[in-house]
Structure formats: structure tokens, C-alpha cells
């Protein structure tokens, strides 16, 4: 009995101490001061209880409850809503039938705004894929009725684009023949093997123009070479020349002379003379600055023999 009483006393003291400490901890956390300055969320419940989470705040949704149900007229309001929906559908069907022509014109306008890139052959599938983003969602019946119209408009646009591409390619070929006729396309024009070889009259005119241009360029090349300039190969009808140095009044730098200095009879040192003309200074008597320490001795000779602590406070800044 004595041992049992002793054990009970010890257990009661331990439990009282632990509970006192537990209540003190909760009181400290719930105090007004700690709630403002020392916010520590209570994690011991979430640590030991796996699925214990604080309750979520439920905000009331504005306009979510039906006013008709509150008044007790829910059935009548639903019937009225169904009647309004049916009447609206009938009106929309009539408007859609009346406005088919206007929508088709608007679609053609929007489709013509998008054109294929230059140099890429357009096909029906590619055109449909590119213009899929511009097509508005329609009903199944409208889509079936407008399918032939869409196909016709697509075919017309493809034909126009092909004609424009052909015209642009023809213009580009003509420009290339005029520009590069002196160097590359002279044989093609004579033989009639160019991209537009069907028109013989135009080829003859282009050949005469290119011959005249070739004569002018050869004469200019001869004149330039007679003056001593170097001419490059004609690139796209343009000449690349380098002007003579006398035009800018510049002279080439003198070549360095190699000298051989004999050091006794053992070996010879062969190299270029070191020209120090560009490194000379008037105050250094023609010697390059930095080879010796003499230039720096004059600047730092004041500090020889004593350190920075000998200036006695701020006297150094007032007696410079």
C-alpha cells in the first residue's frame, strides 16, 4: 500500500506539472500581445492529427439564391423562362435566315484580308487551315448551306494569288537579267533559254542594253587600271575598287631594317630594330617611360625616409 500511494503521488505531481505547463502555454499564445506581435500558429494538433485542418470560411454568394423560391412562385417563374427561351429561339432563326447574305459578304471580306506568303504555293487545304481561326462558329445547317459558297470564293482567291505570284516572278526575272546581264545572263539571252524565252523582241532589246552596259563597264575598268587601282570582279553590276593612297594623302610606313649585331665570336643576334620614336616624351629626354625607375623617383621621392604618420594630423592637407 505504501508503494502504491507513493507511485500515485508521484504520478499526480507529474501530471499536475505537465498540465499546468500546457495551460500556461495556451494562455500565452491566446494573449492579446502575442496575437499581434508574436504570431505562432498552433501546429501540435496538425502534427499528431493527420487529417485535422481548420474549417474553411464560407462566403455568401450574392445573387445565388432564387428570389422566386423565397416568394413561393418557383414553378411559375420556370414556365415563364421556358416560354421566353422558345420565343427567342424562333426570333434568332428568322434573323439568321435574313442575314445569310450579309454574313457571307463579311466572311469574304475577312478571308480576303489574309493572303499567303510570297513564294509559297497555296493549296485548298493550306488555305482552309490558315483561315480556320477567322471562321466564326455556326450551326450545322448554316455550315452546310454555305459550303459551296466558301469553296467558290476560295477557288477565286487562289486563282488571283497564282496570277499575282506569276507576275511578280516575271518582274523579278526581268530585273535580274537587266542587272546581271553583263556577267551571267548574256548567253541565256542570245540562246533564248531564259525564264521568259517566249518573247524574242524583248530579248533582243535586253541583249542590246546589256551589250552597251558591258562596253561602258569595260572602258571604265581599263581607265581605272591605267591609273594603278585594283579592280574586283563585277558583282551584281557593281564595281569594287580600291582608290590609290595618294588620293587621301597617306604614305605607307617605312620598312624596318634588319641588323646583325656581333657579340664576340660566339653567336650573332638577328632581329628588327626597335623604334622608340612614338614613345618619347620631352621631359624624359627621349627615353621611353617605364623602362627605368627614374621617372617615378621624382614623383615619390617626397615619401622617402618617413611614413604617412609624420604629417601630424591634418597638416598634410593644408601644406601641399
Curated annotation (Swiss-Prot):
Disulphides: none
Biased composition (Polar residues): 177-188, 249-261
Keywords, in A-Z order: Biomineralization, Cell adhesion, Glycoprotein, Phosphoprotein, Secreted, Sialic acid, Signal, Sulfation
Taxonomic superkingdom: Eukaryota
Biological-process GO terms, alphabetical: bone mineralization; cell adhesion; cellular response to growth factor stimulus; extracellular matrix organization; ossification; positive regulation of cell adhesion
GO molecular function: integrin binding; small molecule binding
Name this polypeptide is given: Integrin-binding sialoprotein
Gene name of the encoded protein: Ibsp
Amino acid at each position: 500500500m505504501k508503494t502504491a500511494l507513493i507511485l500515485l503521488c508521484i504520478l499526480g505531481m507529474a501530471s499536475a506539472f505537465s498540465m499546468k505547463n500546457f495551460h500556461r502555454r495556451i494562455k500565452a499564445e491566446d494573449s492579446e500581445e502575442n496575437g499581434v506581435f508574436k504570431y505562432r500558429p498552433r501546429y501540435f494538433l496538425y502534427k499528431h492529427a493527420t487529417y485535422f485542418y481548420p474549417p474553411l470560411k464560407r462566403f455568401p454568394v450574392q445573387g445565388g439564391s432564387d428570389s422566386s423560391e423565397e416568394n413561393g412562385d418557383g414553378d411559375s417563374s420556370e414556365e415563364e423562362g421556358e416560354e421566353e427561351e422558345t420565343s427567342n429561339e424562333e426570333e434568332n432563326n428568322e434573323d439568321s435566315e435574313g442575314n445569310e447574305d450579309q454574313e457571307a459578304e463579311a466572311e469574304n471580306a475577312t478571308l480576303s484580308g489574309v493572303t499567303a506568303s510570297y513564294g509559297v504555293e497555296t493549296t485548298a487545304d493550306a488555305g482552309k487551315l490558315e483561315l480556320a481561326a477567322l471562321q466564326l462558329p455556326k450551326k450545322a445547317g448554316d455550315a452546310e448551306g454555305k459550303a459551296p459558297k466558301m469553296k467558290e470564293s476560295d477557288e477565286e482567291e487562289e486563282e488571283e494569288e497564282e496570277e499575282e505570284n506569276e507576275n511578280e516572278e516575271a518582274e523579278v526575272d526581268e530585273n535580274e537579267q537587266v542587272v546581271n546581264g553583263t556577267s551571267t545572263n548574256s548567253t541565256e539571252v542570245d540562246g533564248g533559254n531564259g525564264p521568259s524565252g517566249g518573247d524574242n523582241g524583248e530579248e533582243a532589246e535586253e541583249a542590246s542594253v546589256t551589250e552597251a552596259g558591258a562596253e561602258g563597264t569595260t572602258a571604265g575598268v581599263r581607265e581605272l587600271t591605267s591609273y594603278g587601282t585594283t579592280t574586283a570582279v563585277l558583282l551584281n553590276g557593281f564595281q569594287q575598287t580600291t582608290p590609290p593612297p595618294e588620293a587621301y594623302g597617306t604614305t605607307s610606313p617605312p620598312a624596318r631594317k634588319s641588323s646583325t649585331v656581333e657579340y664576340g665570336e660566339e653567336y650573332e643576334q638577328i632581329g628588327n630594330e626597335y623604334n622608340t620614336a612614338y614613345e618619347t616624351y620631352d621631359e624624359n629626354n627621349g627615353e621611353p617611360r617605364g623602362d627605368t625607375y627614374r621617372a617615378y623617383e621624382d614623383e615619390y621621392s617626397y615619401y622617402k625616409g618617413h611614413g604617412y604618420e609624420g604629417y601630424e594630423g591634418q597638416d598634410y592637407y593644408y601644406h601641399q
